[in-house]
Amino acid sequence: MTELHAEKGYAVTKLCELAGIARSAYYKWLKWMPSDRELENLALAKEVKLRYDKRNGILGYRQMRTQLNRKLKKRYNRKRYYRIMRALELKAVIRKKRPNYVKAPTLHIAENVMNRKFQAEVANQKWCTDVTELKYGNGRKAYLSAIIDGYDNSIVSWVLSHSNNNELVMNTVKKAYKRNPNATPLLHSDRGFQYTSLEYKQLQKRYKFTKSMSRVSRCLDNQPIERFWGTFKAESFYLEKYDTYDSLLRSVRTYIHYYNNFRYTERLNGLSPNEYRRAV
């Protein structure tokens, strides 16, 4: 504006009108002289820019303060450096946060070898296993693990526990082999964490069973044990209220004994699972 007025002779009033500023503001600007602090800030801003470029933009206002105060032998505070760097639009290179990786356990997954062919020609040829949740008392939880034989639908072994953990599943398998030490079944399960664990894989090597697993979200791939859960809950669990873990345990034990020995089905020629098992 000053150049246009001096060189072209344009009226200051017209130029101020075009610029949208008051004439008084223009004259005030002409008379403005920077204060000592403003001059100091300008000098400091120059030092900040030089140091920022020299360090390839890695300095934030804290490090900038430490380095320049030492160089200039000053005690400027952090806010001053912060304001100057913000005015100059200087930002430190942000260090990328290192991902907090938690190494996931190796999953030992098997194919769906069973492929829904559950019918077995002999006992201990095909087993299916799973864990179901049972509630008792005031919302407390227990977990029932069981193995069912595809030959006669008998419950080969079962374990009730307060915790749904590896130990529950391992004890169920060990109990089944204690009763059937020479069994070499195809043992089918879902892909729950217990069945994909290293401990389960080691148990497989120990007992030499063939591992089979359901496909993801395909509960019908494990139909025999799923059907048993439905039968057990409809005929026993849902009919009673269990105030304690011990009362639930007694009920489970009573029902499975009944199921194996006295629940007769047409599929087994009118026999119970254990009767059919002994008859052949």
Can you say where each PLM-predicted feature lies in the sequence?
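An active-site-proximal beta-strand-loop segment
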Residues: A120-V156, H162-S163
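Active-site beta-loop-alpha junctions of metal-dependent nucleic acid enzymes
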Residues: R140, V159-N180
